[in-house]
């Protein structure tokens, strides 16, 4: 998608424990990267799949499919290590991180959208219920990154669970996620006085709160009070994004699964595109094939653009008829176990490229191959983008689309026919870690897209008539490694012969 430039041992009720941290149990608890072994998942349904209720999805010790309690604890540990570096020179200052979940959003009265968790919150704990708060607190007398992780979650409520389904509650939250402590959401207010203290640095994204109501009820008064303190509230999102930028082996495995199943969905959608065909049918076919193979949802509204509509980069109406002889550009991806894919392919719906279509398609395919070869440590998306524009400029000259263009104007001319970047970071979000600049040197573990395109509107009088109305983009998902790049979407055909064979395959 183009991107514009154990039965848990709970702490006693807060009413009996001033400030959440003064009880005997808290002082005796061991805080470490290892989950407490005696915490058993409650033998009931929680607010999300668990190894007890969904053994076909999660192994024991996993919080979300493929990701263990230890992995989530390590993420929190790494975040507190970054905060330790940021807070150097602030000896005697407590550090507290606050991350809010998403709320439930509604399309109309009493009709909710499917809930999707805030990805920064999800990245740090794996908890998938709305109206929750994650707190990471430094420990008195211990240096960072030592800390304790606390979840504040919705209270068990039989009347609401009758309508909305089960909630994890404090016992389920602590056992499933492996955090150190869990309380009901209402008990968060008892933590606020400590955070308001002069000796406490709070890390919280008050400029872009993910949950407006929780921000208004709890965090806005805190940020206003801290504005008068020497230790003001500092944003934490960029630190989390720095961690999310480099994927672990477990994350890459999740993304490989998403890439493979999306590739298979593309193959089946290509096969189903017999001309004439409605864009809406291909949309439905693609979504069905993703979901049938285990995807949770689509990663974004797909672009299913036939003919000249492929020149609208984020065309998502998907309601027109694609005629015999036209190509379709399908930009689609899925979300599987919290990680997404993002793939684009362009093909003729009748199964045969015309000569002009083949010329333009082969030009983009060559450019994409050259850009993929640049996906190695030390280069950057900006470097690859510059190379893409150079290559596009040369191809536009070769095809006779750009004439009499001086070398110093080639970039500008190339941007006319490819107004988007070469790619973006990919992970839990499609346009992942948006605060991270594309000038960063690539490192092993980064996942990016490479998606050159050429778009020639049907009213472009400068281009040869045979190319007018054609738009081609080819997009793959790439893991940067120490060696050659790992293409997560390698199973998705893009050679012209392969595409034509699939489209002409017998039913």
UniProtKB/Swiss-Prot annotation:
- The EC number(s) this enzyme carries: 3.4.11.9
Record's subcellular location: Mitochondrion; Cytoplasm
What does the note under cofactor report?
Binds 2 manganese ions per subunit.
Q: What span is annotated as transit peptide?
A: 1-31
| UniProt KW keywords | Aminopeptidase, Cytoplasm, Hydrolase, Manganese, Metal-binding, Metalloprotease, Mitochondrion, Protease, Transit peptide
Residue sites binding substrate per the record: 300, 331, 342, 424, 431, 451, 475
**GO CC field:** mitochondrion
According to its UniProt record, what is one Pfam family this protein matches? Peptidase_M24
Fetch the SMART domains from UniProt: AMP_N
Q: What class of enzyme is it?
A: hydrolase
Q: Which InterPro entries match?
A: Aminopep_P_N (IPR007865), Creatin/AminoP/Spt16_N (IPR029149), Creatinase/aminopeptidase-like (IPR036005), Pept_M24 (IPR000994), X-Pro_dipept-like (IPR052433)
State a single Gene Ontology molecular function.
manganese ion binding
Needed co-factor(s): Mn(2+)
Query: Which ranges does the record mark as transmembrane?
Result: none
Q: Does the keyword Chloroplast apply?
A: no
Binding residues annotated for Mn(2+) 1, in chain numbering: 342, 424, 451, 475
Give the multimer and partner information: Homodimer. Interacts with TNFRSF1B/TNFR2 (activated) and TRAF2.
Q: What does this protein do?
A: Catalyzes the removal of a penultimate prolyl residue from the N-termini of peptides, such as Leu-Pro-Ala. Also shows low activity towards peptides with Ala or Ser at the P1 position. Promotes TNFRSF1B-mediated phosphorylation of MAPK8/JNK1 and MAPK9/JNK2, suggesting a function as an adapter protein for TNFRSF1B; the effect is independent of XPNPEP3 peptidase activity. May inhibit apoptotic cell death induced via TNF-TNFRSF1B signaling.
Q: Which family does it belong to?
A: Belongs to the peptidase M24B family.
Query: What protein is this chain from?
Result: Xaa-Pro aminopeptidase 3
